[in-house]
From Swiss-Prot:
Residue positions where Phosphoserine is found in the record: 332, 336, 363
Family, similarity comment: Belongs to the Luc7 family.
Stretches with biased composition (Basic and acidic residues): 232-257, 318-351, 361-371
Alphabetical UniProt keywords: Coiled coil, Phosphoprotein
One cellular-component annotation, GO: U2-type prespliceosome
Residue ranges of coiled coil: 87-177, 218-259
Name of the featured protein: Putative RNA-binding protein Luc7-like 1
Region: Disordered, residue numbers: 232-371
Record flagged with keyword Protease: no
Gene Ontology biological-process annotations: mRNA splice site recognition; negative regulation of striated muscle tissue development
Record bears the keyword Coiled coil: yes
Originating species: Homo sapiens
Tissue specificity field: Ubiquitous.
Amino acid sequence: MSAQAQMRALLDQLMGTARDGDETRQRVKFTDDRVCKSHLLDCCPHDILAGTRMDLGECTKIHDLALRADYEIASKERDLFFELDAMDHLESFIAECDRRTELAKKRLAETQEEISAEVSAKAEKVHELNEEIGKLLAKAEQLGAEGNVDESQKILMEVEKVRAKKKEAEEEYRNSMPASSFQQQKLRVCEVCSAYLGLHDNDRRLADHFGGKLHLGFIQIREKLDQLRKTVAEKQEKRNQDRLRRREEREREERLSRRSGSRTRDRRRSRSRDRRRRRSRSTSRERRKLSRSRSRDRHRRHRSRSRSHSRGHRRASRDRSAKYKFSRERASREESWESGRSERGPPDWRLESSNGKMASRRSEEKEAGEI
């Protein structure tokens, strides 16, 4: 990669897809299914194992450092759960690697001579010491490259101790089997990267293997897979707790709403009972008022009839007394007139008739006035 391409990639990684206003690059978002989620989390095997004996070639999905920068910015604000996709990808890759390791072990078991369990255990011990020496040498070289010379020297001293143990283990292994068989190269399969390791490999060969890009790449992938499994488990546990808390809150709200609804119904019922009670009271009051008004009307009518009856009775009695008085007075006048007529002799009949008419008219007028 040229220096210009490296600078461009660095700018993409730092500033994202919108670093220079290129709209064509912004058409593909990091959430697109075509984007490699393992690349966004910096654990894609196609990137890690590039340039090794197990180079996988170019990934079928989009790899873009700018999209990774966009994802890192967005993941600080909300959880996108891309770890689950990356974990599935790495699990399938590691499962394939483990399958190749088992096949290599079967081929070695078929091609190499059968040895006893005791000899096999001694050979396995030599392999383990070789692996430890190779890891320590690789670590010492890494520390020396970083400038930690003192730490590197300490690790080299540990390497010398392990070499002494390895020499003793090789002597035990050599003495436990014939010389012809011992000279035969005994191989084993690396449990990390499925590469072949020899029992008699020198330290340089072991350091190159355990410090090589292939072995370290597989270590990185396996460690990243363990980290993703732990992260996914924690997030799933957190999500389950959040879901449980939301469900409890929802149930509590439903209980509160049911309680408030029952209280509302009780209040409605009490209000309806109060309305019915007030309505019945008002109805009874209306009825009592109506009955009292009816009784007062009956009493008033009765009193009116009584007063009218008494007034009629008094008027009739007054009429009867007036008639009786008038008849007595008339009788007395007639008697007095008859007595006077008998004393005076026969009067003039015309005068008598006129006087009688006048007297009768006066009596009628008087009677009418009294009535």
